[in-house]
Curated annotation (Swiss-Prot):
GO terms for molecular function: GTP binding; GTPase activity; translation elongation factor activity. Gene3D superfamilies: 3.30.230.10, 3.30.70.240, Elongation Factor G (Translational Gtpase), domain 3 (3.30.70.870), P-loop containing nucleotide triphosphate hydrolases (3.40.50.300), Translation factors (2.40.30.10). Pfam families: EFG_C, EFG_III, EFG_IV, GTP_EFTU, GTP_EFTU_D2. It comes from Botryotinia fuckeliana (strain B05.10) (Noble rot fungus). InterPro entries: EFG_II (IPR041095), EFG_III (IPR009022), EFG_III/V (IPR035647), EFG_IV (IPR047872), EFG_V (IPR035649), EFG_V-like (IPR000640), EFTu-like_2 (IPR004161), G_TR_CS (IPR031157). This is Elongation factor G, mitochondrial. Pathway: Protein biosynthesis; polypeptide chain elongation. It is found in: Mitochondrion. GTP binds at residues 108-115, 183-187, 237-240. Residues 1-63 form a transit peptide. Its main location: mitochondrion. Mitochondrial GTPase that catalyzes the GTP-dependent ribosomal translocation step during translation elongation. During this step, the ribosome changes from the pre-translocational (PRE) to the post-translocational (POST) state as the newly formed A-site-bound peptidyl-tRNA and P-site-bound deacylated tRNA move to the P and E sites, respectively. Catalyzes the coordinated movement of the two tRNA molecules, the mRNA and conformational changes in the ribosome. GO terms for cellular component: mitochondrion.
Length: 804
């Protein structure tokens, strides 16, 4: 940074100081946009507050001197104004607040005990006064399952947010940590709830079953955590179950999830005799006493029969840490033993850097060893200041900008979830930078509209606690803000936007209509609400049949919405047979030369397009989206007409010629053509391209693609033959089988079309003891006979409509 820029920055800083003192909006806006080597004068402002003092309350000469000193340091050392440097120099109160904040999610395979574990967390932190179980066995149900359907079915359908304070003993005294927690669904049909939770969280607890270990949805959750770079600790639950084998689960984390993992604990007993754990770092035995395990008892007396195992597992922990942390590696190579503090610091570093996951174990249902998991959340998961969160600066071609969890900086937040409540739309927001205050005006980066925040609440499942302000790094909900999921909000001075969450495409559809016309209004309200709340739930009206079509992630997903419509809106509906989301593609290169020519007196239509269609070779992730390219030379087609050609191509790909389903893996090139001085128009070229596409597509040996689902089935070993028979009837491809002492797990790619009704057949084949889960894997060519039937049925339906 040149000294000229430093001088300009100091001047900007001084101007900003006056603006902040006088709260002049225009001056403040200019201040935020002052150029200081791409960092903006706002960092200079912050720099002038370093060292825990608000230097803007001092004289102008001192203020400018402090700013100049900071900026001169930045000129010599660019790292002086990095996020880390700012965090290191926050005032003591702000630094201490951030250090004690944890934003975490609990995620796992279905029925691994997420909600049960969350219930214990809330009880042990004093957030609830009594423990209630999943499925509403005591007519109350778990706190985080607030929907009636969740309590009936015993599954989590919507992610639920809460907050609590955990008193952790550090250096002989209690330290209070503030935990924002989101409990997520385990069923793949509700995967969007996991996606949007992990998008805004700083860390996670991945729960595994001590018997089943890594399961299909565990692998999906692992993939989602990697997508958003979320550090995790692992908690092996259900240690009291018959067949519990925690070290097998640790081995599966290493092998199947391919992330280095090591146990921090050894169980004291197992199955019915599970009684506590040995902490391998401090080498202490930990027991839970009291009616609900609320009293923690620690002792130096490790059971004699476990001493050798504990020594082996502690050595393995140190060896694993040496592979992922340089400091422990040096100690290990010097054949020394790391101290407790060195081990904990190394686990924290490696976990936050996504190089390692520490593994704890316990039984939430038996009220054992949940508190040590809470200690691990505080010890090993990051606080908001330790996570890199990026925004995109619209002024600089969407260059990434680091956000800093500091209350004094301009506000930046992300709306990640919407819910309808009795008081209107409830919008969940993660505050990444600055603070959000009641009555504050914020700007939606997508719509460029200003909105006022009338009310801020903290959520405790379905209960609300109103607050006047939320600080940086926190999660809250607001009322009265019209927005979409994934919208970025700022204070108006920063042209920032943030990337949204990944939204998978639906794989199943069905037609739906109210049974009576008088329910039409409520039916429309329900459709609009469900679409706003859930990005994976799609609604459209078929242009030809005029039927309302809903699409989602699976049968259960759509069944839940149909049931919610009946319960929440009192609308009885009729649904059609579920329809698979097929795709279409070509397999051969086809050249086209098509002319559209219409003359009806006066101005006519004329457009000639020349080029070719060709298949895009499927990659490791399957069929790619269809693409368009123009290679016209000599100006035979003008740019505006080429743009119309592309629009025609994209419109054609939305509704393919074979079945009316979207087109994948097809590349169109327009390399020549002709225009007419008066008869050519954008509409003519769009129509000509669509006609050329349809004709060429049918000449390119087209195929129907069907979705294949990665299906995981678990059942007792005696039913293995029955299940293999069921899959063979469906032409499934078995990719993996794992046989345990009692149960086996089978993984196969199955056609979604063949899986309708599989649930009832599986129950019959396993006497109700089998379970299965599906998630979308990839598209593949459908069997030839099925393709013929589908095309024939589609053509017949089209002909019938034209007759009408």
């Amino acid at each position: 940074m040149s000294m000229h820029r430093v001088a300009r920055a100091v001047a900007s800083t001084e101007a900003c100081a006056g603006a902040l003192r006088g709260s002049v909006p225009r001056a403040r806006f200019l201040c935020l946009n002052s150029p200081v080597q791409g960092l903006g004068a706002r960092n200079a402002i912050l720099g002038a507050r370093l060292g825990g003092k608000r230097h803007f309350s001092q004289s102008p000469i001192i203020r400018a001197g402090v700013a100049q000193a900071v900026l001169e340091k930045a000129a010599a050392d660019p790292s002086a104004l990095t996020q880390e440097a700012i965090v290191d120099n926050l005032n003591a109160a702000e630094r201490d607040r951030l250090r004690r904040v944890r934003n975490i999610g609990i995620a796992a395979h279905i029925d691994s005990g997420k909600t049960t574990a969350t219930e214990r967390v809330l009880f042990y932190t004093g957030r609830i006064n009594a423990i209630h179980e999943v499925r509403g066995k005591d007519a109350v149900g778990a706190k985080m399952d607030s929907m009636e359907l969740e309590r009936e079915k015993g599954i989590t359908i919507q992610s639920a947010a809460t907050f609590c304070d955990w008193l952790k003993v550090e250096n002989g005294k209690e330290e209070k940590y503030h935990i924002n927690l989101i409990d997520t669904p385990g069923h793949i049909d509700f995967t969007i709830e996991v996606e949007r939770a992990l998008r805004v969280l700083d860390g996670a607890v991945m729960i595994l079953c001590a018997v089943s270990g890594v399961q299909s949805q565990t692998i999906t959750v692992d993939r989602q955590m990697r997508r958003y770079n979320v550090p995790r600790i692992s908690f092996i639950n259900k240690m009291d179950r018959m067949g519990a084998n925690p070290f097998k689960a640790v081995e599966q984390i290493n092998q199947k999830l391919r992330i280095p993992a090591a146990a921090l604990q050894v169980p004291i007993g197992s199955e019915d005799s599970f009684n506590g754990v040995v902490d391998l770092i401090r080498m202490k035995a930990i027991y839970n006493d009291g009616p609900k395990g609320e009293i923690i008892r620690e002792t130096d007396e490790i059971p004699e029969e476990l001493k050798k195992l504990c020594e082996e597992k502690r050595a393995l922990l140190i060896e694993t840490l040496a592979d992922v942390d340089d400091e422990i590696a040096e100690i290990f190579l010097d054949e020394k033993t790391p101290s407790i503090e060195q081990m904990k610091a190394a686990i924290r570093r490696a976990t936050i850097n996504l190089k390692f996951t520490p593994v704890l174990m316990g039984s939430a249902l038996a009220d054992k060893s949940v508190q040590p998991m809470l200690d691990a959340v505080c010890d090993y998961l990051p606080n908001p200041a330790e996570v890199e969160n990026l925004a995109l600066d619209k002024r600089r071609a969407e260059a990434p900008v680091k956000l800093v969890s500091y209350n004094e900086l301009p506000f930046v937040g992300l709306a990640f979830k919407l819910e309808e409540s009795n008081y209107g739309q409830l919008t969940y927001i993660r505050v990444y930078q600055g603070s959000l205050k009641k009555g504050m005006n914020v700007f939606n980066a997508r719509t460029d509209k200003r909105v006022k925040i009338p009310r801020i609440v903290r959520m405790h499942s379905n209960e609300m606690e109103e607050v006047p302000e939320i600080g940086a790094g926190e999660i809250c909900a607001v009322f009265g803000v019209d927005c979409a999921s994934g919208d970025t909000f700022t204070d108006g001075g920063l042209p920032y936007s943030m990337s949204s969450m990944f939204v998978p495409d639906p794989v199943i559809s069905l037609s739906i209509k109210p049974k009576t016309t008088k329910d039409g209004s409520n039916f429309s309200k329900a459709m609009n609400r469900f679409q706003r709340e859930d990005p994976t739930f799609r609604v459209h009206v078929d242009a030809e049949s005029q039927e309302t079509i809903i699409s989602g992630m699976g049968e259960l997903h759509l069944d839940i919405y149909v049931e919610r419509m009946r319960r929440e809106y009192k609308v009885e509906v009729e649904t059609g047979k579920p329809q698979v989301a097929y795709r279409e593609t070509i397999t051969e290169h086809v050249v086209f030369d098509h002319t559209l020519k219409k003359q009806t007196g006066g101005a006519g239509d004329y457009a000639r397009v020349v080029g070719f269609l060709e298949p895009i070779e499927p990659g490791p992730n399957g069929y790619a989206p269809s693409t368009f390219k123009e290679e016209v030379t000599g100006g035979s087609i003008s740019d505006k007409f080429l743009f119309a050609c592309e629009k025609g191509f994209l419109a054609s790909c939305e509704k393919g010629p074979l079945l009316g389903h979207p087109v994948l893996g097809t590349h169109m090139v327009v390399n020549d053509g002709a225009t007419h001085m008066t008869d050519s128009s954008e509409m003519a070229f769009k129509n000509a391209t669509q006609q050329a596409f349809r004709k060429a597509f049918k000449e390119g040996k087209p195929q129907v693609l069907e979705p294949l689902m990665k299906t995981t089935i678990t059942a007792p070993n005696e039913f293995q033959g029955n299940i293999v028979g069921l899959l063979n009837k469906r032409n499934a491809i078995i990719s993996d089988t794992e046989i345990g002492p009692e149960d086996f797990t089978l993984i196969a790619d199955c056609s979604l079309n063949a899986m309708f009704g599989f649930s009832s057949q599986l129950r019959a084949a396993t006497q109700g003891k089998g379970e299965f889960g599906m998630e979308f894997s990839h598209y593949a060519p459908a069997p030839g006979q099925l393709q013929k039937e589908l095309i024939s049925n589609y053509e017949k339906a089209q002909a019938d409509r034209h007759k009408k």
